[in-house]
C-alpha cells in the first residue's frame, strides 16, 4: 500500500495517503480539544453517579440533599432508583451507593446517617374505636415490635385492617382520617400535629428506632462526584443531630 509516490521532481500523496493524513490531523485536533477542556475544567467535579434509595428517604430527605448537590456540582449527571430497602439491596450492584433503612449491606462500608423514633398517630376528633389500623410493609422484626407495643398499650389484639406497601401512603390515609398508624419521626414533618394525638412507640423499655445507612464500596471514593455526595449527606446527618 503506497502512501506517497516519489518522483525526481516531487513527492505526491496517494488517495490512501490523503485519508491517513486527514485522519491524523483529526486525531491531533481532538487531542488538542481534550487538553484544552481538561485545562479549562481542572478541578471541576463532573461525571455520573447512580444512587439506590429507600422510598422513605427518597420522599423525605433526598430532595433537599439533591437540590444542594446539583447546585454545588451542576455538571454531574444523577440517576436515582427509589424502592424498598429489600429491592435496593437486591440491586446494589447497579449503584455507586445505596441508602437503606434497618439493614446494613454485607461486604460494604455502612455508615449510620439517621436514627429516628416512631410515634403512634391518631386523629383527635374521631373515636379511636371507629378507626382502622393501618400497617405499612416492613421487615417482620419491625412489625413484631409494633404489634407488641400495640397489644401492651391497648390490651387488645393487633389486627390491622389496611395494608400498604409505602409508608407515605399511611401518612396520606392518616390525613384523610381513615385510620391510625405508626410513623417514623421523619414522616411527621409536614403534618399539622395539632390535629393528632402523638405517642412515642416503645420496644420494651426503649424507644422504637429505625436506622438509616449509606452503603458503598471504598473504591467508589476515588470518584470525586461520589465522594462529594457522600460527604454532603454525612454533613446533613451531623447537622440534624445538633
What is each of the regions a protein language model found here?
Residues 52, 118-144:
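Short loop->beta-strand "edge-of-pocket" segments that line small-molecule binding or catalytic clefts
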Residues 200-242:
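A late-sequence structural motif
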Residues 132-156, 222-223:
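Secondary-structure junction motif
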Residues 84, 155-201:
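Hydrophobic hinge/microswitch elements
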Residues 20-42:
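Alpha-helical linker/hinge and terminal dimerization helices associated
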Residues 46-105:
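Central regulatory/effector-binding core of bacterial HTH transcription factors
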Residues 1-13:
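A short LG(V/I)-centered, amphipathic sequence patch enriched
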Residues 109-119, 185, 194-211, 218:
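Short beta-strand->loop
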